[in-house]
């Protein structure tokens, strides 16, 4: 039974990774360029030194969206349950988890938030991965979801990953990261 579950997890992770990789490659061919500030507002970005656990990181990252009414508490719980049930497939780029739940799980509008951690946290309960950032993707309208997924392309760029790890990075610096 455990072997079957591991195979299921591996297939799910591999197919999701392939889908994201295909998206990122197609996005790199586009002419229009964007910055993080095009997708996340300054009040939805947080920088912390440390976080005790991956589920706490998701809760903290989501808190600005919850306060504004963009998402409900159950959306946060469903994101945490998705990691518990499906593993770390949401870590699309090195050390960054792009967490989300379903369109019927308490999302009111497309939104996004980012939590940057100075000290990485271990993400997931199995297939654990080290992360330094959590990006919350609140996708209510599937037709517009590719706009939010552009964040993965921007944050996945090597120079942007290096910048995120600099000790003196500010919210303004994060907003200016671009593709």
Where are the predicted features?
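Cytosolic covalent-transfer regions centered on His/Cys nucleophiles
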Residues: 1-179
């Amino acid at each position: 039974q455990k072997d079957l579950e591991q195979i299921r997890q591996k297939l799910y992770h591999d197919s999701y990774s392939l889908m994201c990789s295909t998206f990122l490659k197609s996005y790199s061919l586009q002419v229009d360029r964007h910055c993080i500030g095009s997708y996340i507002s300054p009040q939805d970005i947080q920088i912390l030194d440390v976080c005790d656990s991956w589920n706490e990181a998701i809760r903290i990252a989501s808190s600005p969206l919850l306060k504004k009414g963009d998402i409900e508490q159950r959306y946060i719980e469903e994101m945490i349950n998705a990691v518990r049930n499906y593993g770390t497939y949401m870590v699309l780029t090195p050390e960054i988890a792009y967490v989300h739940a379903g369109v019927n799980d308490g999302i009111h509008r497309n939104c996004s938030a980012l939590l940057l951690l100075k000290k990485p946290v271990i993400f997931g309960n199995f297939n654990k991965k080290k992360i330094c950032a959590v990006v919350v993707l609140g996708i209510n309208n599937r037709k517009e979801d590719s706009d939010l997924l552009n964040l993965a392309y921007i944050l996945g760029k090597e120079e942007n990953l290096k910048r995120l790890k600099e000790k003196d990075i500010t919210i303004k610096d994060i907003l200016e990261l671009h593709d």
